[in-house]
Amino acid sequence: MSLPYRQIHLDFHTSECIEGIGSRFSRENFKAALQAGHVNSITLFSKCHHGWSYHPTKVNLPHPHLCCDLLDEQLAVCEELGVRTEIYISAGLSEQYAVRHPEHLRRDKNGYGGNFDTEAGYHRLCFGTAYLDQVAAEIEEMLTRYKGRFDGLFLDIIGMVPCWCPDCVQGMKERGLDPESDADAWKYARVIYDRYTDRVAEVVERVIPGLPIIHNDGGAIFQGRDIAFCNQGHFELESLPTGGWGYDHFPRAAAYARTLGRDFLGMTGKFHTTWGEFGGFKHPNALRYEAALANACGARCSVGDQLHPDGEFDLATYNLIGAAYAEVEAREPWLTGSALTADIGLLSAENFRRICPNALPDGNLNPDLGANRIMLEGHYLYDILDPEADFGKYRLLILPDTMEIPEGELRDKLNAYLAGGGKLLIGACHLRNSKQCRWLCGHV
């Protein structure tokens, strides 16, 4: 099944303090919402950040006030309408589990994992502990229970972060790493990330081979292809412009994602601000703009919503979404099978920091943000590149002014590009540095 253009990401993070979960759900109401919104794909919840499941379970805990098998009911409507479905599991968070198993919390360098009594909010769990077994069991149970009824698995809160819990400290020592070193802690964080993604892939391949898997890290696409390709299938770029990401984030992320050879979508929200804002409605023109921007950047669309705890869909929300998605639907004959073309390649400092440590002084992204704005505002056809990109596809490459090109594979690749007739746009970093000038002089 090709990736649809009009998706909903239906959050359902619901506290145990709320009663009557799903009590007002009706298939007719859900069907009316999907039709009003011109929706042809949706992400539905198996388990939320609070840790509760929304269907019968033997390996986790169902929400204590769940009135029905809500996931089954929602899937039945989507099957009737032919709407594609993904199923969501909050992997990095499970608050009810964290309360019962604080030994599995992610901990900072001082061993602190959070205070349940005085600090409101979710507490991050560590995949380097036995919690990974719990997540794997939840995934396997859900896959088995609903096999053949859905089209993808969405796992949330998957960012790679260092941890100093006892299991991680012991693991670092066993590999000859120093827990006192932040650099070594990050190396071990990658070990744990790979262990998690490998475990998930093994479970999915055993139960539903080939099922698309999304490992969501808040739209953080600039971590290298090896991390990006842990996603099996397409990419989903979470990027709510009014929810902390800003209007710079998505066009920049999309300009890189479209070079990776996979379909991808841009995930905004219906909220005036950010996730979970039940009373907030984005102006229809803003949502129309964000959907059009996604299409213009080569992406499909996803709009975030949060279902009321009683399970009744707000038709005003879906009329709002429908104002944008009706226009996307009308564009689809021209979008389907098309590809964005570019003749300028922008070498992102963020993408090159792995081989050029000086590329991002103090972690400042402003050079990348500014260059991307110039490309957008000048209406240039461009992509954002990483070291593995095919430079020969572009007539012009623009180098970050913060980044010196070290001797080695990247410099050789740029030399070959120039020898083949390509052009480089460079700035002060290269012109003022005699060593940088020297390797460029042969192409002047």
Model-inferred region functions:
Residues 2-4, 33, 64-74, 85-87, ...:
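Carbohydrate-binding surfaces of carbohydrate-active enzymes
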Residues 87-147, 186, 199, 386:
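Active-site-adjacent "subsite" loops/lids of carbohydrate-active enzymes
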Residues 11-13, 43-50, 89-96, 154-164, ...:
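Short, solvent-exposed turn/loop segments enriched in Gly/Ser/Thr/Pro and often Arg
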Residues 12-26, 119-134, 274-284:
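Active-site mouth loops of central-metabolism enzymes
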Residues 54-66, 91-120, 155-180:
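Aromatic- and acidic-residue-enriched segments that line the glycan-binding/catalytic groove
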Residues 6, 39-41, 148-151, 300-301, ...:
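Short acidic/polar active-site loop segments enriched in Thr and Asp
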Residues 48-94, 404:
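Aromatic-lined substrate-binding rim segments of carbohydrate-active enzymes
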Residues 1-51, 81-83:
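N-terminal structural segment of carbohydrate-active enzymes
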